[in-house]
C-alpha cells in the first residue's frame, strides 16, 4: 500500500505557494513534469486565482537564481497540489525546513493528500464528517481563442465554491474606485481585457487585464477550504417542504446554519427543483408564503449573511456586490420552462401578499416570459375563483402604485412629518440635509405608510393628512367661537379685483364695493396729510424724526357707514353690554352647539399631533386610511414588523406575541415554583416536628438540639411581661379619667402582647413555659406597679377600681381580643382588691430562673386561646402564604405521591390548598361591601398608620398548621367602611407588552384596537390584555411611561433599496421625547415617583371618533375630575387651551407638576410658621 505525504503551506501576504522543480524536488509534479522547451521559456502562463478569474501573465520566480524562466506544464501548473505531495518523507521534510508555517501529514491515498494540500486541516474534518473525500482538482486544458486558460479550480463542483473566488457572481476589481452603479449585467460568456466593468457570464467571474496591468500583484488565492458544504438533494427537498409548509423559524435556522441552501457554487440561487430550476422565491410565489419570501429577501440583502458565506477573507465591497447580485437573481430570474419570474407566478395565481412583497423592492422588474407577456397581463390567470377586489388590488400593485409615508428621524433631532407620495420604483430620499449646514444630514426612517393607491389619490390623501381641513362657515371652530381669541383672519383671493363686472354676479360686485379698499380709493380722492415742517418731501438723513402715527385700518364704504361696530367687535368689554347680557342664554346654547361640533377633524387632529409626537401622526393617518378604505401599515417595535394591528393578521401576531411571553414567564417561574414547593415541604416537616415536641414536653426540653440555646425561658418571658406591665401602668395612671382611651390603649398593648406570646410559642426553646398563666402574671405585675407607685392616690385607686369593674361588665360576653382584655381586667381587679391584705412584691427581686418559676407557679390559669392566628400580622402573613400556595397548586397541579418519602403526606397537605387563577402570586383587592359585611372578626382593627389588607378565605383550604376558626371572621366598626379592609381576592393581570406594567406602547396599541371587537374564545390573551387596559382611567393612562429600555431590533423594511438602506439603524428612538404631556416624559429615568394623587390633566379621547374630555377643577383645595358637558363651553375651552399651552418645555412641565401637587393639600394657617404673617 502506497503512502503519500502532503505538505500544507498557509496563504501569506505574498500570495500562495507556487511550485517549481528546484523547490519541490521529489514531489509527484517534479517527477512527472515534461522536459522544458527553451522556445517557450520566455513566458509562462501562470494560474490565476482560484476564484475562476481570467489568467494573467507572470514572469518566472526570481528565487531560482537563473535568468531562464521556468517551464509550466499544462498538467502541472505552479499552483497544482501535486507540487507538495511526496512519496518520500525525507523530500517532504526539506520543504518544512524552508517554510516554518508548513505542516506535514501522511495519507493512505492521493485524493486525501490533495485535499489536505489545498484546504488544510478543515478538509480532514470535512472528510470525517461527511464520509467522502474531496474531488480531484486537476487543470482543464481548454484554450480559448484569446489565449486564456481556465483556472484549475474553476470546475463547477461541490468543492469549488470558495466564497472568495470560485464562481462569485460579482467582484470588485483591484484598484477600482468605481461605484456599485457601474456594475452591469451581461449575457456574453467572456469579457474584453479592456473592459472596465464586471460581467456575469455563466455564473463565473473574470478580472480585467487592464486593471491587472495597472496594479500587478499576486493573485488572492485562498488556501482555506469552503466553510460550508453543498446540501444534498434530499436536504434540498426537505428545505423546499419547509418553505411550502410555512415554517419560518425552521427556514431561518437552516439558511443561517448553511448559506449554501440559498447560494449555489456559482454565487447564484440554489435550484430547489432541478427540472424547471425553481429557486426558493419561485416556491414562495407558488404557495403564497409572503412572510418567508420577505425573510429570504431580507437575508440575502444582509451584509452579515454574505460575510458569513464569504468568510473572513471577503471584503466589504465583495459582500455588497454579492448582495446586489443575489437580490437581482432572486427577484428577476426566470424559470427554465416558461421563462417566468416569481412576479409572474404570484400574479397569475392571484397572491396579493406575495405581489406586495415583490413590488416593494425597486430591483423587481416587470419582464416578459417566453410568450411575451408581462405579469400585469396574466393577473389571476390560474385562479378562477379570484374576487373582483383581488383583481383590482393586483392591477393597482402592478400599475405604478403609490404610498404616503410617515418619516421620522432615527435620532429624534427632527419632528416627524408626512412624506411626499412615492412609488417603489422611485423610493423616498431618507437623507435629510440641513439648509444651514450642507455637510450635516439626518437619517430618516419610515414608521408608517398608507397605500397602495393611484398617484392622484395619493396626492389628495397627502394633502388631507398633512393639513387638516379648515373650519367652514356652518361648523364653528373653538378658536373662532371663543371670546378669548381674535376673529379668524381670512385672506382674500388675489384675483378678486381683477374680475370684470360681467364675470361676477351683482351681489358679489356689491360686496366688493362695500368691503374693498380699492373701490374706496378709486371712488374718492385720498386726502393729503399734513407733514410737519411744512414740506411734503421726506428728508433722507438721520435728523428727520418722523412721528409715529396711530394704526389706521383701511377705509371701506361699509366701515365708514358703521365705524363703531368694527371697534366694538374688537373691544374686550363688548360682552359686558346689556344687549349681549340679555342674549347670554342664546350665546351659551350657540357655544354649546359649536363646542359639540368644534371637536371636528381639524381641532382633534392638530391636538393629537401636538400632544403625542411618538404616535400622533400614525393615529391620524390610521383613522384617515379607514375612512378612505385604504390599507395601512405601521411599524411596531415589539413585533418588529410593519402591519395593521387591527386586522386579522395583526391580531393573530399580537396573540402570538402574548402567548410567547406567557410561555417565557412560565419557563422562568418553573424553577421558582420548584423552590416554593421545597420550602413548603420543609415548613410542613417543621410543623410536624413542633407538634411532636409539644406532645412530649419533658422529652423535648431535655433534648440537646442546636436550636436550644436559651437556658432561662421563664426569665426571658418575665422580662418581656415586665415591659408590657410598665407601659400598661403608665397608661392607667395618665388616662385615669378617660375610659375610652384606656380601652383602646389596652387593646393595642394586648395585641402586641399576643404577637410576642405567639412568637414564644413557635420557638422550641420556650416549650417548658406555661403560657396559660400570662394574663394572671401580667395582671399581678400591673397591680404591683400600681400599688408601689407614689403617683396613685386613694381617690385614683378607687376610680381605677370602678373603671375596671365597668370594663369587666362590658367585656363579659366578648370574644377574641376583647375577651383577652376582660380576662386581664378581671385578674387586675382581683389583685388590686386583695392588695391591702396580700403581699404584692416588686418584680425586681426575681433575678434567677428558680424565682421566676416559683412566681409563675402561684399564678392562675385562664381559658384564653393563644393561637397563632389571633395575631393580625402573623395571620395575615400566613393567610397570604396559603393563598399563594393555592395559586401554585392551581398553576402547577398536584404533585405525584412519592413512595418511601417520610413527609409525603405533609407535603400534599401543604400543597393541597384551594384554587385560584394563574398569576395570583401578587393579588390586588377590590372593594366589596357585601363581603365586608359578612366578615365578623374578633381581632380586626384598622390602624391609620398601617395599611392592612384582609382577604376572604372562606373558600380556600388552608395548609397544615393554620386554623380557620377565628381568622375567617373579622369585625370593624360598622359606621366606617374602610377601603383597605373591604377587599376581595382577585388575580392581578401582569402580562403587558414590555413587562408587568403598562407603558405608552400599550396605550398606542389600545388606541389602534379601540374600534375592534376582540373575541374571547379565539384571542384570549388579547382579550385579557384589552380588558386590563380599559380598567385604567385617563389620568392613569397619562402617567404610563414610554418604552425606553427596549431591546434594539432591526425593523423589516417595507421595501429594499440600495445596500446602504440595509445597514440603517432601527426605528426605535434612543432619546426620550419631551413634547408629550406625560409624567414619564417630564422626569426621565423615574418610574412611579410622582404624587400619590396624580394631577388630572385635560386629555382628548383615545381615538378621533370619541369626544370625551376630562377637566380638572379645584373645589375646596381638592382636585375633582369632572366631565365636560354642553352647559359649560367656556370652562371646557379653557381646559383645552390649557392642555395645549401648559406643556411647552420640560421645565414648565416640572413646575406644573409640583404646583398641582401642592395645591391638592389645603394648609391651615396654624400649621405653618408663616400662618401669622399678614
UniProtKB/Swiss-Prot annotation:
Phenotypic effect of disruption: Animals die as third instar larvae, are smaller than wild-type and show very severely reduced brain volume. Complete disruption of brain morphology, especially the optic lobe, in 3rd instar larvae.
Q: Return the Polar residues bias intervals.
A: 521-532
- What are the start and end residues of each ANK repeat? 338-367
GO CC list: cytoplasm; endomembrane system; endoplasmic reticulum; nuclear envelope
- Keywords on record: ANK repeat, Cell cycle, Cell division, Cytoplasm, Endoplasmic reticulum, Neurogenesis, Nucleus
Per the record, the domain of life is: Eukaryota
Q: Which PROSITE patterns match?
A: ANK_REP_REGION, ANK_REPEAT
Q: Which InterPro entries match?
A: ANKLE2_3rd, Ankyrin_rpt, Ankyrin_rpt-contain_sf
Comp. bias (Low complexity): 37-56, 150-164, 174-198, 205-219, 533-543
- How changing residue 326 to H affects the protein? Pupal lethality at temperatures above 22 degrees Celsius. Larvae initially have normal brain sizes, but later in the third larval stage, the brain is smaller than in wild-type counterparts
GO BP, sorted A to Z: asymmetric neuroblast division; asymmetric protein localization involved in cell fate determination; endoplasmic reticulum organization; mitotic nuclear membrane reassembly; nuclear membrane reassembly; spindle localization
The subcellular localization recorded is: Endoplasmic reticulum; Nucleus envelope; Cytoplasm
Name any one GO molecular function. Answer: protein phosphatase 2A binding
The record ties this protein, via PANTHER family, to: ANKYRIN REPEAT AND LEM DOMAIN-CONTAINING PROTEIN 2
Q: Its family?
A: Belongs to the ANKLE2 family.
The free-text function statement in the UniProt record for this protein reads:
Involved in brain development probably by regulating asymmetric division of neuroblasts. Regulates neuroblast asymmetric cell division by controlling asymmetric protein localization of Mira, Baz, Par-6 and aPKC, and spindle alignment. Also, regulates the localization of kinase Ball during mitosis, specifically maintaining Ball in the nucleus during interphase. Required for proper ER and nuclear envelope morphology in neuroblasts.
The protein's name: Ankyrin repeat and LEM domain-containing protein 2 homolog
The source organism is Drosophila melanogaster
Amino acid at each position: 500500500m502506497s503512502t503519500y505525504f502532503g505538505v500544507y503551506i498557509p496563504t501569506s501576504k505574498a500570495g500562495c505557494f507556487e511550485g517549481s522543480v528546484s523547490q519541490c524536488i521529489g514531489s509527484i509534479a517534479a517527477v512527472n513534469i515534461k522536459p522544458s522547451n527553451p522556445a517557450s521559456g520566455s513566458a509562462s502562463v501562470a494560474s490565476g486565482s482560484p476564484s475562476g478569474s481570467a489568467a494573467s501573465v507572470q514572469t518566472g520566480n526570481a528565487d531560482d537564481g537563473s535568468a531562464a524562466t521556468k517551464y509550466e506544464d499544462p498538467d502541472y501548473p505552479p499552483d497544482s497540489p501535486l507540487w507538495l505531495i511526496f512519496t518520500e518523507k525525507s523530500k517532504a521534510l526539506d520543504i518544512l525546513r524552508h517554510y516554518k508555517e508548513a505542516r506535514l501529514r501522511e495519507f493512505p491515498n492521493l485524493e486525501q493528500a490533495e485535499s489536505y494540500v489545498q484546504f488544510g486541516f478543515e478538509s480532514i474534518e470535512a472528510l470525517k464528517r461527511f464520509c467522502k473525500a474531496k474531488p480531484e482538482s486537476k487543470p482543464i486544458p481548454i484554450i480559448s481563442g484569446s489565449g486564456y486558460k481556465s483556472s484549475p479550480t474553476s470546475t463547477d463542483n461541490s468543492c469549488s465554491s470558495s466564497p472568495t473566488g470560485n464562481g462569485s457572481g460579482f467582484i470588485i476589481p483591484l484598484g477600482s474606485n468605481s461605484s456599485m452603479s457601474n456594475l452591469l449585467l451581461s449575457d456574453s460568456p467572456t469579457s474584453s481585457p479592456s473592459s472596465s466593468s464586471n460581467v456575469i457570464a455563466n455564473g463565473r467571474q473574470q478580472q480585467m487585464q487592464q486593471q491587472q496591468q495597472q496594479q500587478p500583484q499576486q493573485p488572492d488565492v485562498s488556501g482555506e477550504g469552503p466553510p460550508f458544504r453543498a446540501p444534498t438533494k434530499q436536504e434540498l427537498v426537505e428545505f423546499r417542504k419547509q418553505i411550502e409548509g410555512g415554517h419560518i423559524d425552521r427556514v431561518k435556522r437552516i439558511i443561517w446554519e448553511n448559506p449554501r441552501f440559498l447560494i449555489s457554487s456559482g454565487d447564484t440561487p440554489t435550484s430547489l427543483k432541478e427540472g424547471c430550476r425553481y429557486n426558493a422565491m419561485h416556491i414562495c410565489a407558488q404557495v403564497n408564503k409572503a412572510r418567508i419570501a420577505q425573510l429570504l429577501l431580507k437575508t440575502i440583502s444582509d451584509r452579515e449573511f454574505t460575510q458569513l458565506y464569504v468568510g473572513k477573507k471577503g471584503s466589504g465591497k465583495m459582500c455588497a456586490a454579492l448582495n446586489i447580485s443575489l437580490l437581482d437573481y432572486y427577484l428577476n430570474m426566470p424559470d427554465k420552462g416558461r421563462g417566468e419570474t416569481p412576479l409572474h407566478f404570484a400574479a397569475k395565481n392571484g397572491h396579493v401578499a406575495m405581489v406586495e412583497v415583490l413590488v416593494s423592492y425597486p430591483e423587481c422588474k416587470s419582464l416578459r416570459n417566453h410568450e411575451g407577456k408581462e405579469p400585469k397581463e396574466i393577473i389571476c390567470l390560474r385562479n378562477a375563483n379570484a374576487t373582483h377586489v383581488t383583481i383590482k388590488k393586483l392591477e393597482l400593485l402592478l400599475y405604478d402604485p403609490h404610498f404616503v409615508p410617515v418619516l421620522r428621524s432615527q435620532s429624534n433631532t427632527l419632528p416627524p412629518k408626512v412624506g411626499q407620495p412615492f412609488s417603489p420604483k422611485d423610493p423616498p430620499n431618507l437623507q435629510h440635509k440641513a439648509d444651514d449646514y450642507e455637510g450635516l444630514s439626518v437619517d430618516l426612517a419610515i414608521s408608517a405608510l398608507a397605500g397602495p393607491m393611484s398617484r392622484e389619490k395619493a396626492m389628495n390623501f397627502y394633502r388631507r393628512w398633512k393639513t387638516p381641513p379648515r373650519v367652514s362657515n356652518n361648523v364653528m371652530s373653538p378658536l373662532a367661537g371663543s371670546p378669548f381669541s381674535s376673529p379668524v383672519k381670512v385672506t382674500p383671493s388675489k384675483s378678486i379685483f381683477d374680475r370684470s363686472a360681467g364675470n361676477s354676479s351683482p351681489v358679489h360686485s356689491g360686496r366688493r364695493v362695500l368691503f374693498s379698499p380699492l373701490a374706496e380709493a378709486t371712488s374718492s380722492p385720498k386726502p393729503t396729510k399734513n407733514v410737519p415742517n411744512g414740506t411734503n418731501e421726506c428728508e433722507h438723513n438721520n435728523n428727520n424724526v418722523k412721528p409715529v402715527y396711530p394704526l389706521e385700518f383701511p377705509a371701506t364704504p361699509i366701515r365708514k357707514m358703521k365705524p363703531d361696530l368694527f371697534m366694538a367687535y374688537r373691544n374686550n368689554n363688548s360682552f359686558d353690554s346689556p344687549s349681549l347680557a340679555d342674549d347670554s342664554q342664546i350665546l351659551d346654547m350657540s357655544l354649546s352647539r359649536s363646542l359639540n361640533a368644534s371637536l371636528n377633524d381639524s381641532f382633534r387632529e392638530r391636538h393629537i399631533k401636538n400632544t403625542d409626537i411618538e404616535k400622533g401622526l400614525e393615529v391620524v393617518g390610521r383613522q384617515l386610511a379607514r375612512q378612505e378604505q385604504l390599507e395601512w401599515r405601521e411599524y411596531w417595535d415589539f413585533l418588529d414588523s410593519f402591519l395593521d394591528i387591527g386586522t386579522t393578521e395583526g391580531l393573530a401576531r399580537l396573540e402570538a406575541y402574548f402567548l410567547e411571553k406567557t410561555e417565557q414567564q412560565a419557563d422562568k417561574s418553573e424553577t421558582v415554583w420548584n423552590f416554593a414547593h421545597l420550602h413548603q415541604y420543609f415548613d410542613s416537616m417543621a410543623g410536624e416536628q413542633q407538634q411532636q415536641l409539644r406532645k412530649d414536653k419533658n422529652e423535648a426540653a431535655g433534648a440537646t438540639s442546636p436550636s436550644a440555646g436559651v437556658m432561662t425561658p421563664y426569665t426571658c418571658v418575665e422580662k418581656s411581661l415586665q415591659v408590657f406591665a410598665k407601659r400598661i401602668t403608665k397608661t392607667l395612671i395618665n388616662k385615669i379619667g378617660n375610659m375610652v382611651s384606656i380601652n383602646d390603649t389596652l387593646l393595642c398593648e394586648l395585641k402586641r402582647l399576643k404577637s410576642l406570646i405567639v412568637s414564644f410559642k413557635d420557638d422550641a426553646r420556650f416549650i417548658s413555659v406555661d403560657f396559660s398563666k400570662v394574663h394572671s402574671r401580667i395582671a399581678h405585675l400591673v397591680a404591683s406597679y400600681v400599688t408601689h407607685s407614689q403617683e396613685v392616690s386613694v381617690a385614683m385607686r378607687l376610680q381605677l377600681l370602678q373603671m375596671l369593674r365597668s370594663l369587666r361588665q362590658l367585656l363579659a360576653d366578648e370574644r377574641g381580643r376583647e375577651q383577652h382584655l376582660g380576662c386581664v381586667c378581671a385578674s387586675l381587679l382581683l389583685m388590686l382588691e386583695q392588695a391591702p391584705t396580700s403581699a404584692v412584691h416588686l418584680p425586681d427581686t426575681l433575678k434567677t430562673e428558680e424565682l421566676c418559676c416559683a412566681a409563675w407557679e402561684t399564678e392562675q390559669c385562664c381559658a384564653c386561646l393563644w393561637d397563632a392566628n389571633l395575631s393580625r400580622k402573623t395571620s395575615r402573613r400566613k393567610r397570604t402564604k396559603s393563598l399563594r400556595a393555592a395559586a401554585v397548586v392551581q398553576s402547577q397541579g398536584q404533585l405525584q405521591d412519592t413512595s418511601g418519602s417520610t413527609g409525603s403526606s405533609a407535603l400534599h397537605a401543604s400543597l393541597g390548598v384551594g384554587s385560584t387563577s394563574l398569576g395570583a402570586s401578587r393579588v390586588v383587592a377590590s372593594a366589596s361591601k357585601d363581603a365586608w359585611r359578612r366578615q365578623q372578626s374578633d381581632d380586626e382593627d384598622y390602624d391609620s398608620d398601617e395599611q392592612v389588607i384582609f382577604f376572604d378565605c372562606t373558600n380556600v383550604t388552608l395548609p397544615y398548621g393554620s386554623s380557620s376558626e377565628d381568622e375567617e371572621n373579622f369585625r370593624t366598626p360598622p359606621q366606617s367602611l374602610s377601603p383597605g379592609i373591604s377587599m376581595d381576592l382577585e388575580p392581578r393581570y401582569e402580562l403587558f407588552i414590555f413587562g408587568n406594567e403598562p407603558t405608552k406602547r400599550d396605550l398606542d396599541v389600545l388606541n389602534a384596537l379601540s374600534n375592534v371587537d376582540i373575541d374571547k374564545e379565539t384571542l384570549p390573551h388579547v382579550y385579557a390584555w384589552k380588558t386590563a387596559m380599559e380598567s385604567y382611567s385617563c389620568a392613569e393612562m397619562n402617567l404610563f411611561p414610554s418604552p425606553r429600555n427596549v431591546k434594539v431590533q432591526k425593523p423589516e423594511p417595507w421595501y429594499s433599496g440600495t445596500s446602504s438602506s440595509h445597514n440603517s439603524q432601527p426605528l426605535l428612538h434612543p432619546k426620550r421625547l419631551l413634547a408629550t404631556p406625560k409624567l414619564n416624559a417630564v422626569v426621565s429615568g423615574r418610574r412611579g415617583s410622582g404624587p400619590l394623587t396624580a394631577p388630572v390633566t385635560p386629555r382628548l379621547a383615545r381615538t378621533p371618533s370619541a369626544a370625551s374630555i376630562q377637566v380638572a377643577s379645584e373645589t375646596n383645595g381638592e382636585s375633582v375630575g369632572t366631565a365636560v358637558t354642553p352647559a359649560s363651553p367656556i370652562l371646557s375651552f379653557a381646559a383645552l387651551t390649557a392642555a395645549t399651552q401648559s406643556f411647552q418645555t420640560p421645565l414648565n412641565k416640572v413646575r406644573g407638576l409640583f404646583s398641582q401637587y401642592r395645591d391638592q393639600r389645603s394648609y391651615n394657617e396654624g400649621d405653618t410658621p408663616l400662618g401669622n404673617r399678614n
